[in-house]
Amino acid sequence: MKKTRCALCYAVLAVCFALLLAVSVGTGSAALSPHEILRILLLREGAGTAAYNVLLKIRLPRVLAAAVMGGTLSVSGFLLQTFFRNPIAGPYVLGVSSGAKLAVGAVMIFGMKLWGCVPFGAVMTAAFVGAMLCASFVMIVSRKIHSMAMLLVVGMMIGNVCSAATDFFVTFAKESDIANLTSWSMGSFSAVSWGNLRICLAVIAVCLLLCLLLVKPIGAYQFGEHYAASMGVNVRRFRGALIGLSCLLAACVTALVGPISFVGIAVPYMTKKLLGTAKPMAVLPGCFLLGGVFCMACDWIARTAFSPTELAISTVTAFFGAPVVIVMALKRGGGHR
């Protein structure tokens, strides 16, 4: 019964994923018909035309980034929730995304000031270092604080400190760079380029493959550290791999499109409820698909709701994701009475 439910959910998610991909590519300030899209993609017709440039240089990389980054952030959230054994953990709430944001902001601001440009590889490295530093601090605190509520407060305080430090660094940026930095810091898919997207896709593909190889240890760890150790899992190395993969995935997203809120918490929860299971072999691909659907839908709303004005992606993800987290927190609180 559960296998049938999972298969049906995957099929529905795959159809929604494909439909949203098609709708997002075709709609916007410049509408493109399915006929135009197919001719450009399959026959490469119309090179140099407005439709060709809009589709291949702006719309397609943006939509693909929304699909992949949404799935990536959801998987990152699932790994963090497994690590802390709490469904309210996530890269944004625990300050991991904010740490990556601070490091990237510092590198971009001072790199542009000193050298005039910053390689995307340096941006990704900075994001990973910032994410790992914040995650390490949260791990140290988690050993001393056994209340998840207090740990979340600590994570939010880390996020506030990192955001304040980023705003401080922005005061040293060139006026020409401030608008781009502000847009990036609020989360946006609008500046995605094929070159940067390819780098992120390569890193994400390796990380997701490693996640699939860790499916059995993750399943054992869900029953507790002692059970995992009894099943032959090297818990210390496994925990290091789990937090490292989660931070690297979150760093890829932050480096490319900036911090995005609530996706890493809301989507894993919705995936488990949808599939009716918490088994990692089922949840991991489900998280990726639902995360892609969620982010594509939010990006489409951000682009079209008040066109030509564009909303920050985190504004839309928070609008739809926050109620899910509130419901989750209420149910969790009710279960502990």
Where do the protein language model's features map onto the residues?
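Alpha-helical transmembrane segments in inner-membrane proteins
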Residues: 1-337
